[in-house]
Amino acid sequence: MSVSVLSPSRRLGGVSGILQVTSLLILLLLLIKAAQLYLHRQWLLKALQQFPCPPSHWLFGHIQEFQHDQELQRIQERVKTFPSACPYWIWGGKVRVQLYDPDYMKVILGRSDPKSHGSYKFLAPRIGYGLLLLNGQTWFQHRRMLTPAFHNDILKPYVGLMADSVRVMLDKWEELLGQDSPLEVFQHVSLMTLDTIMKSAFSHQGSIQVDRNSQSYIQAISDLNSLVFCCMRNAFHENDTIYSLTSAGRWTHRACQLAHQHTDQVIQLRKAQLQKEGELEKIKRKRHLDFLDILLLAKMENGSILSDKDLRAEVDTFMFEGHDTTASGISWILYALATHPKHQERCREEIHGLLGDGASITWNHLDQMPYTTMCIKEALRLYPPVPGIGRELSTPVTFPDGRSLPKGIMVLLSIYGLHHNPKVWPNLEVFDPSRFAPGSAQHSHAFLPFSGGSRNCIGKQFAMNQLKVARALTLLRFELLPDPTRIPIPMARLVLKSKNGIHLRLRRLPNPCEDKDQL
């Protein structure tokens, strides 16, 4: 038997040939990909030729325009320059079309287009596929099943829970008054709204605002909200594998594990309680049914119940949507009143007329605050908690002015742009609650702090109740004053925040009329 031995030069030649072929294949694939991106960009340019926009870089698009937390200023500039809608390019072949006209909003929100996958996929590890991220028939089934959880009869007992949480926050503020320095309110309000959600969703005992045992869970929730937004703004993090290898990816994984573990433990404990014979009747006698009770007892139309994974997703979605969004709304409302003392005093007089005898705030009081409600709505116009929402067109669409967009285009409904559109809101920077006076004429889609259409915020009433309770109890105890040295700079995150915080000075009111629960 003969054995042939390749010489070193022949072996090297074989390896070199393989490397050359591999390099050529990689180059060919890159050329094909580049050609695909070029052709796709050309298709987009043709599809969007009816929608002018500022000049963009061929690779980076308009990304640089939206750096340094200037997105909201850029949106306002576009609203004034480009009627109704304006594309903005990101990374060459990707584009979003911003809409900020009420007629355009009405068209899109009247359709059943799915949420934009590119904009919302980063939330999936955080909250799972609950009502916010679901689409199609599954979304419809979950929406129908969850609607009873937000019925007025269910929401009524929550008013007392909201008041309890607000009172704890105000007590903390009173302790801090001795420091004679402005108070950054958003962090306090965010913790208070999380406290309210914990009580409403889980019947949590005590207050996480003062419970040190809850700090790790609170930190995980806060970290996830920040990490998700940073991930959305980094093109390299769009790839799950790459993101998982980064420090932020590992941090996100740990925070998700902690948050999900907490939710899972609560769900399993409650399931075990409800499975005991007669336990449900005992619960009803002791307390109101909370969000988790209703989820566990609910059934689909086919008689099936939610899986543990679906339960966690819906609970985490409720926690996410009802926490930072409401905190943003309350914080900006307090700032708006601090900078408009006449409106603040008129709201206080209205609330004093309802609760001035020391009455506890109840469900029935919430509909007896017309001027306070007008001020809340005007603050939500100026500072919408959710700056924008995304949709991916499932079919072509034609707008009332004749312009059209093809299937597959991502549209961003800029609620901030809509609320700051001078063609919709004259003197738009003026805080004018009379815009929302009874009988005032408005386009049906000119004011969308809770979105609109079939996919509007299911917890709208819950949120409005909390805004009213927080506003009422705060004004009864404190006079709100702005800090002229630190004027808030609004910036778009998952919710509307301030780049430098929301700092207010508080002045304790003499002989405050507080609700009976404080006695």
From Swiss-Prot:
Record's bilayer topology term: Peripheral membrane protein
Matching CDD domains: CYP4B-like
Catalytic activity reported: an omega-methyl-long-chain fatty acid + reduced [NADPH--hemoprotein reductase] + O2 = an omega-hydroxy-long-chain fatty acid + oxidized [NADPH--hemoprotein reductase] + H2O + H(+)
Keywords from the named record: Endoplasmic reticulum, Heme, Iron, Lipid metabolism, Membrane, Metal-binding, Microsome, Monooxygenase, NADP, Oxidoreductase, Phosphoprotein
Effect of C231R: Allele CYP4A22*2, allele CYP4A22*3, allele CYP4A22*4, allele CYP4A22*5, allele CYP4A22*6, allele CYP4A22*7, allele CYP4A22*8, allele CYP4A22*9, allele CYP4A22*10, allele CYP4A22*11, allele CYP4A22*12, allele CYP4A22*13, allele CYP4A22*14 and allele CYP4A22*15
Positions of modified residues (Phosphoserine): S440
Main localization of the protein described in the UniProt heading: endoplasmic reticulum
Molecular functions (GO terms): 16-hydroxypalmitate dehydrogenase activity; alkane 1-monooxygenase activity; arachidonate monooxygenase activity; heme binding; iron ion binding; long-chain fatty acid omega-hydroxylase activity; medium-chain fatty acid omega-hydroxylase activity
Top-level taxonomic group: Eukaryota
Effect of V185F: In allele CYP4A22*10, allele CYP4A22*11, allele CYP4A22*12, allele CYP4A22*13, allele CYP4A22*14 and allele CYP4A22*15
Class of the enzyme per the UniProt entry, highest EC level: oxidoreductase
Subcellular location as annotated: Endoplasmic reticulum membrane; Microsome membrane
Effect on the protein of changing N152Y: In allele CYP4A22*2, allele CYP4A22*3, allele CYP4A22*4, allele CYP4A22*5, allele CYP4A22*6, allele CYP4A22*7, allele CYP4A22*8, allele CYP4A22*9, allele CYP4A22*10, allele CYP4A22*11, allele CYP4A22*12, allele CYP4A22*13, allele CYP4A22*14 and allele CYP4A22*15
Similarity comment: family membership: Belongs to the cytochrome P450 family.
Protein name listed in UniProt: Cytochrome P450 4A22
Gene from which the chain derives: CYP4A22
